[in-house]
Amino acid sequence: MMFCYQCEQTTRSPAGIGCTSEPGTCGKDEATAVLQDILTHLMKGIASMRAGRAMGVADRRTDDFIFYGLFTTLTNVNFTATRFVHLIQEASKRRERIKLLYEEAAREQGKTPEILSGPALFQPADSLEQLLRQAPSVAINADVEHLGSDVIGARALILYGMKGVALIAQHARVLGYQSDEVMPQAEEILDYLASNPTDLDEMLEESLEVGRLNLKVMELLDVANTDSFGAQEITSVRISPIQGKAILVSGHDLHDLKQILEQTKDQGINVYTHGEMLPANAYPLLKAYPHLAGNLGGAWQDQQREFADFPGPIVMTSNCIIEPGRSYKNRIFTLGPVGWPGVRHIDNGDFTPVIQAAKALPGFTADAKEQRITIGFGHHTLLGVADKIVDAVKHGDIRHFFLVGGCDGVSPARNYFTEVADNAPADSVVMTLGCGKYRFNKHEFGDIGGIPRLLDIGQCNDAHSAIRVAGALAEAFNCGVNDLPLSIMLSWFEQKATAIHLSLLALGIKGIKLGPTLPAYLTPTLVQKLQSRFDLDLDLIGEAQADLQAALAHTA
């Protein structure tokens, strides 16, 4: 039986928490859910051979595979069961190869190989039917009756954080950026999970290691994006269509977007970004393409309506895909780790089918009324005007900063974030990132002495920029980040948000408001431990005005 509770929208009922019947809330069927558990288990098995790295046993392709494989198991990434069967087979082969290399290196160096157990020895079956029979023994909640939900939840916190790390690392790796520090630490954490830990305090400390690793990975991706596409710059981006054939690119992968822009040059096709791809319009080497026409639509949960209305093909480069509607299923394409049964997948970097579809479809028949928003306030931009921001604070023009953003979702409780942003006083600045920004990024915020009151920092992955800016302000005021007139309100949905949140906790940042609901895997015991240590507030529903007043009172 399937069991999944990794996303914010997991089933919650009097009978219990977690999606236990198909389809899950995300649309995942039982086969896909349990195959993802098996693949994750095998990734731990590969990591269990980490002792070989010190003996010179390292395989970049296997390193890539670990991150790629974990990426496919995130919420709203891949729903194709047959694809997971192939990934499981590949994982098993890679694990055995690394095992042989490790044992050979140990013999050559006169060392005794470690005795392997658990995921390192698990043998996946050959057929889908047999794999489904094996799945219960490796499920996230395996043996919960004996271990208890606290232990399972603490393990889940680490695992889901690592899935988020894998996603961000994979985006950097496709741009050719890797770090000799990242993979050994990732293996260490996965190997720790493979040991089936049970000490709650120890596991919460290990979750902070996930956060520290994610800080390195986010910085690596920032360098990769900046080196590849230039530093984000303040940009007025069009958010209404113009006449012409069109392609819509959603997801997060800037490398994929660059390939599409390159292959559509001089083809008479306009390329639009969607969702978390919005910040692409602020990178100099991407916006230099004249046919990058702007951004259309909003956050991932609105895609079924927005994609149905779009008169051209759609390309999903990463999460978040949800079940394609009939009206556009034959004109949506997936790339890389993304997949949906019956949807065409491009795995060779050749976008000819997308281009052909764009030419065959009507496109936009007329220009819409021009609408624009301003983006591009990454840390390179903001640190360049840090002295101006500091002066505004010292002179009382800026009283408070709010960081409001993260993942969006369907829950009406997420209106909290709109209320906070819209009701923040005129002498405050709202920084935002992730697709949560779409709840208010088309609203008018004005400016303070030429400093825009709404600063769009970028994707969820660009939380690194927010951290850099907060650190620079703390240094300028000779205080800690927790002493700044800064309030952090984060919306979460999936595992990347978990990794980012763990990074903030690892930095010792307190008073974070997380919502709209409590992660299902955080039991009351775990919540109590987190709240006592990190001054966390996990109950946001209906408290926007009160939270604003409390934040401003603290500043005063």
Swiss-Prot record:
One GO cellular component this record assigns the protein to is: cytoplasm
Q: How is the cofactor bound?
A: Binds 1 [4Fe-4S] cluster. Binds 1 hybrid [4Fe-2O-2S] cluster.
Q: Which residues bind hybrid [4Fe-2O-2S] cluster?
A: H252, E276, C320, C407, C435, C460, E494, K496
Q: Which residues carry this modification: Cysteine persulfide?
A: C407
Q: Where in the cell is it found?
A: Cytoplasm
Q: What is its EC number?
A: 1.7.99.1
A single GO BP: response to hydrogen peroxide
Which residues constitute the signal peptide according to the record? none
Instruction: Write down the chemical reaction(s) this protein catalyses.
Output: A + NH4(+) + H2O = hydroxylamine + AH2 + H(+)
For this UniProt entry, the molecular function terms from Gene Ontology, in alphabetical order, are: 4 iron, 4 sulfur cluster binding; hydroxylamine reductase activity; metal ion binding; peroxidase activity
Keywords from the UniProt entry = 4Fe-4S, Cytoplasm, Iron, Iron-sulfur, Metal-binding, Oxidoreductase, Plasmid
Keyword Lipid metabolism, does the record have it? Answer: no
UniProt keyword Nuclease present: no
Cofactor(s) this protein cannot do without: [4Fe-4S] cluster; hybrid [4Fe-2O-2S] cluster
Chain sites annotated for binding [4Fe-4S] cluster: C4, C7, C19, C26
Please report which protein family the annotation says this sequence is part of: Belongs to the HCP family.
Job of this protein: Catalyzes the reduction of hydroxylamine to form NH(3) and H(2)O.
Q: What is the protein named?
A: Hydroxylamine reductase
Species: Acidithiobacillus ferridurans
- Recorded name of the encoding gene: hcp
